[in-house]
């Protein structure tokens, strides 16, 4: 078999007159009265191959048996197309290959999905036949971008003198965070490893070990409920460094991301990226990962509402809640009563009891609550919301958390429905100064907002023992277009501070020692100040490639129920395998 001389998508007018050897898949076959045209495809693109009896009867006879997705080896001569046959939409659209020989390397059954960017296959079918789905050019281009992003990051970190170090996949289960995937030990009866949710502890121990600058393209595993932008196994760019301040870490990440955007996407973004404190993000956008590609900020009306004529507003403020509003500029005519009812049901999903609304017309406010506002209140309301005729005003009165969640989600929905989001924009943002701890009323305890190893502000360390809810974290999240790309922090590196953190989280001294004794001891041997960040590679590629689902950036992903339709994992195992592990199954009975 002769060696391939050209990739299909790389045959251009410069090759006219040359004999070429091509190998690839049949994208399309057309029989035009004695001539057969085949579009031959490989990962670089498509080239048209012509089978003509005047060139080779033998090749034509073989071509008559060929169908879509057959794998071919074609030998032929490159010729220019006639004027009427030129296709400038293809890189190879000015030439075609006159076939002299063809060899079928492998036949193919009729495929269950159309191998094209605009395939009509359902996602389940695409996942079941993932190896066929991956043949689509849009999928290859996505993974080419993933490769380019990873290569750029590796090259950048190498120039910054970071070492790539692999950390264990079989590790210790810890109680914080999401559920672990557990792996039973055959050697140690009744004991289990856990697959890592992140390399957090090991990368900190590498700092204790004096490596100073570490990174890893790390596989991570979390047994949590899935959604469009979550997978049970995922990849993060994990970075840690000693002796750097928060500003130095953020500056380095900005330089890295601007290079990624330029090299992998061809887009120039400016640095430094804007910074916003967590409290401001929640107040202005109702989100800790605000999409700043469009305006429409939340406006706090609590002071006005405390003394207005609308009892729903006043009672919310009196009970310690708040009232906030969104002004959807020019949207009054675009939303009917039925549409607003749909928005009301939408905010109820986020805990809101309802959605109050007003439309601004030339002669004043109109809507079901307009009667509660006199002329003076109406003027204050319009002035505060900068409202003009044609605007739609939307209000939620409730607990602060409910107001933020519901209006934050509503803002994003309106942004999409009103086409306010410029898809060509890439707006990076740092969200800083996070709360260190969050209180869970159901569990009646504090949880770490990021993780238990985040350094509080120095002046807040004592608050861990007196008022944990007031302690601030030296933490930072990187946001792109409303998606959290990753998060990081400066880390605790002193035993006494780490013990205070564990105590605030409800750990007894014995529990802390049992779970994290190795880390606490390490902190007694001269641990340097350190910090870092973990960036979600899958999510970054999803955004840069213009995909809407993380599954499109992972070669062999899981479904929303964490199953693989291709291999049918997870699956039962043989009884003998369980016996080797000294395990017995006790399955719940189906009701």
Curated annotation (Swiss-Prot):
Signal peptide: none
Keywords noted in UniProt: Aminoacyl-tRNA synthetase, ATP-binding, Cytoplasm, Ligase, Nucleotide-binding, Protein biosynthesis
Membrane-spanning parts: none
Site annotation Important for tRNA non-discrimination: residues: 84
Any one Gene Ontology molecular-function term assigned to this protein's record: nucleic acid binding
Binding of ATP, residues: 222-224, 231, 484, 536-539
Catalytic activity: tRNA(Asx) + L-aspartate + ATP = L-aspartyl-tRNA(Asx) + AMP + diphosphate
Cysteine disulfide links: none
EC code(s) of this entry: 6.1.1.23
Name of the top EC class for this enzyme: ligase
UniProt keyword ATP-binding, yes or no: yes
One GO cellular component term noted in the UniProt record for this chain: cytoplasm
GO annotation, biological process: aspartyl-tRNA aminoacylation
Entry's localization field: Cytoplasm
Function of the protein: Aspartyl-tRNA synthetase with relaxed tRNA specificity since it is able to aspartylate not only its cognate tRNA(Asp) but also tRNA(Asn). Reaction proceeds in two steps: L-aspartate is first activated by ATP to form Asp-AMP and then transferred to the acceptor end of tRNA(Asp/Asn).
Record note on quaternary structure: Homodimer.
Protein name per Swiss-Prot or TrEMBL: Aspartate--tRNA(Asp/Asn) ligase
